Amino acid sequence: MELEVRHLRALCAIADAGSLHRAARRLGVAQPTLSTQLTRIEQALGGPLFTRERTGCRPTPLGRTVLGRARPLLTDMNTLVREARAAAAGGDSRLRVGSTASRALAGWLRRLRRPGLEPTLQMDVSANALLRRVTDGQLDVAFVHEVEGCALHIPEDLRLRVLVEREPQFVMLPADHPAAARPVVRLADLADDRWMVDPTVDGEWDGVHRMLRAVGLNPRVLHGDYHTAASLVATGEVVTVCQPSSQSRPDTAVRRLYGDPLGVRLLLAARTRAELDAVFPALEDAYWEAARQSTAYREWLEGGGIRTLPRCPVAATGGGRVEFVRAR
């Protein structure tokens, strides 16, 4: 059996839903049909992708690997279909936006959309890959993050604008974890926990490893994407670093890390300053809107966490031009 796009959609639906029953309902198929399809996919790939339990399904290590590759492929396929249909219909002008994961995306795209201009979105866990696509003319702008201590490779001909010089990274842990009872968590409180990181995100593993090593921790580490990490946190299997704008859920808690030991720089990249000027205000508004919707991040901001930055161009890693803007 050859793997097809519909098979990848089924796998992602199972992972997101947490059970075959819920995934089948979302896909509009019978559960036995989905179960049979999953078995055939597993046979084609050479091993089990999910463990079946009474409470639902969880990805196996092989499943996490497959899901980590499947999600960006599905995003690319959806973008291809959408852009092809628009081109066939003589559609509106397109603004090609690239981004690493961010809760600001929905608000940003909503603000950019207007008569005669329809933004398209291409997601990628690799900030360096997105920057290369801007340079190559495949994207108009890209919103990326740079893990401190892990400089991005910024092409010479790009211009960048800094949205936030240092966004602190928080931790997502099970809601019933003893440390979740406090608003600020020390890394020592998580010494016995397994951590999950996504090694495909530029700089994430190095940044997390350096943060843990600085306080003498050498925990067990699992590799997987953000969606898998969130589901495993909910079941009490792991803890993970997360963006401060992440929302707590009934089964998970988002908390600040004591001393803010890990941060990222948020950058917008384009080939010209005019392109930056055209989209940056909408991104800025969307980011702070998302930031204040998170209780933990809002409290951190109200405590004076973000520094005021002067506007001034400086040389970026690799020679691109970076502009700082005043934080709100």
Swiss-Prot record:
Pfam families: HTH_1, LysR_substrate. Keywords: DNA-binding, Transcription, Transcription regulation. It comes from the Bacteria. Residues 1-60 form the HTH lysR-type domain. SUPFAM superfamilies: Periplasmic binding protein-like II, Winged helix' DNA-binding domain. GO terms for biological process: regulation of DNA-templated transcription. Residues 20-39 bind DNA. One of its GO terms (cellular component) is protein-DNA complex. Coiled coil: none annotated. CDD domains: PBP2_LTTR_aromatics_like (cd08414). One of its GO terms (molecular function) is DNA-binding transcription factor activity. InterPro entries: LysR_subst-bd, Tscrpt_reg_HTH_LysR, WH-like_DNA-bd_sf, WH_DNA-bd_sf. Belongs to the LysR transcriptional regulatory family. Transcriptional trans-activator of the gene (mprA) for the small neutral protease. This is Small neutral protease regulatory protein.
